A protein has these predicted regions:
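A short core secondary-structure module
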Residues: 167, 172-218
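Glycine-rich phosphate/cofactor-binding loops in nucleotide/flavin-utilizing enzymes
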Residues: 11, 92-93, 114, 254-269, ...
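A structural signal for short hydrophobic beta-strand segments in well-ordered beta-sheet cores
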Residues: 160-163
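Amphipathic, small/basic residue-rich leader segments at the start of a protein or domain
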Residues: 1-109, 130, 134, 362, ...
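C-terminal helix-coil-helix/basic helical segment that borders enzyme active sites and/or dimer interfaces
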Residues: 30, 295-298, 309-364
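N-terminal glycine-rich flavin-associated loop
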Residues: 107-126, 152
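A short, Trp-centered hydrophobic/proline-enriched beta-strand micro-motif
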Residues: 138-146, 188
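Glycine-rich beta->alpha junctions and the first turn(s) of the following alpha-helix
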Residues: 5, 215-312, 380
Length: 407
């Protein structure tokens, strides 16, 4: 389609909105200075359960204002509430948002980054018309009801049952490692609807009301002491057939579409509060607690820096290559592998330089603060599918290698 306004015109519009809505970041405050401010670090921006209410109000308020200003779904189709512009327009505005002090928007990532794009691709026009505007406006919080105690990376082994009852389905089963379930309004749920069919062909996907009778959400406490995940019990939860996504027994394709977005980590929500921050912070650790003249330390720093730059360049290239409504292909999974490689190189450097400071709080700024990051890193290797599963998928679907022998 032909864009109706230029990127510069959109940015001028976006800048006016942001100036009137949120404060701009102070360049001096953003500049990293060792020992100044909080030394807190997280792998990802997190939602504190104790402050969930105020976080939700702030995130939903900003998302609603952004959407009402025509900036909430810039590359979405007009018929579903989008602006109808290009992916380049959307990326340009997301980068502009990064210059402002936005509220914590991580609670919206599943809706805007994973489920919203998937629904646009595979859901019925009725579902798209009804739900997509609400998702991109921040009116609805989403979660993914995929993993189960006996079906993690192998989602085709899902055992949660959905039994037809007239115009409704009764869903019974257990899901685990569900982010945002405690705050969600809807969950996209994969269920087994034909136990006699091959496991990939007997699945159907539904949108479940997380406030419905029979839904029980319980927090899971991680080794960091936080509870960013949940287990969800479904006991004969009634779901109308109108909330089915895709055809009956064709749910595995829906799963792949959602995971294509998750594993590529291409989301319109600007990331603030997660990650290691500027490379200067990593150098500061080596300078304060190690020896910058040591050749091994310098080699480790070079490896970490190279991985950071490679990730940035790969992410920029892949995001720019996506067209509106296009589902990321399996090659996007290389991002997940690259992220884990970077984290491992960083954790190795931190262990060598900080030693016991990683597990014993000595009160030194910038030392024990890394403990949360290090403890959270193993989960990033598993989230969105274990690395072994991801490598198999890349080998088979990108490189054309033969499938693994199966029993």
């Amino acid at each position: 389609m032909t864009d109706t306004i230029s990127i510069d015109e959109l940015l001028a519009e976006g800048r006016a909105f942001l100036d009137a809505t949120v404060p701009a970041l102070n360049a001096a405050d953003e500049e990293f200075v060792w020992g100044r401010g909080s030394d807190q670090l997280n792998v990802l921006e997190e939602v504190d359960r104790d402050h969930l209410g105020e976080i939700l109000v702030a995130a939903k308020g900003y998302a609603a204002a952004r959407y009402d200003a025509g900036l909430g779904w810039i590359d979405g189709p007009v018929e579903y509430g989008g602006r109808g512009l290009s992916t380049e327009h959307a990326i340009a505005f997301a980068e502009l948002e990064g210059l402002y002090e936005l509220p914590n928007l991580s609670i919206l990532v599943i809706a805007l980054g994973f489920v919203g794009p998937a629904l646009r691709s595979v859901a019925s026009p009725e579902i798209c018309s009804e739900l997509l505007p609400k998702l991109y406006r921040g009116d609805l919080i989403m979660c993914q009801l995929f993993s189960e105690p006996d079906a993690g990376s192998d989602l085709a082994a899902a055992a949660t049952r959905a039994v037809r009852d007239g115009d409704e389905w009764l869903i019974t089963g257990q899901k685990v490692w569900t982010s945002s379930a405690h705050a969600a309004d809807l969950g996209i749920c994969v269920c087994r609807t034909d136990p006699d069919a091959p496991k990939h062909r007997g699945l159907t996907t539904f949108l479940v009301d997380m406030h419905a009778e029979g839904v029980d959400v319980r927090p899971l406490v991680q080794m960091t002491g936080e509870a960013n995940f949940n287990e969800v019990f479904l006991n004969e939860v009634r779901v109308p057939d109108s909330m089915r996504v895709g055809d009956v027994n064709s749910g595995f394709g829906v799963i792949l579409t959602v995971l294509g977005n998750e594993r590529s980590i291409t989301t319109r929500a600007p990331k603030r509060g997660g990650g290691v921050g500027p490379f200067e912070r990593v150098v500061g650790v080596a300078r304060e607690f190690g020896d910058l003249s040591d050749p091994i330390t310098r080699q480790r720093l070079a490896e970490v820096y190279s991985s950071m730059r490679i990730r940035e360049l790969m992410n920029a290239r892949w995001r720019a290559s996506l067209q509106p409504g296009e589902t990321p292909g399996p090659e996007m999974m290389l991002q997940k592998i690259g992220n884990h490689a970077f984290n491992q190189e960083l954790v190795t450097l931190l262990g060598e330089v900080l030693g016991p400071r990683l597990i014993a709080d000595t009160g030194e700024w910038g030392a024990y603060a890394w403990a949360n990051y290090v403890l959270s890193t193993p989960g990033m290797r598993i989230g969105g599918g274990t690395e072994e599963i991801v490598r198999n998928t890349i080998g088979e679907r990108v490189l054309g290698l033969p499938r693994e022998p199966r029993a």
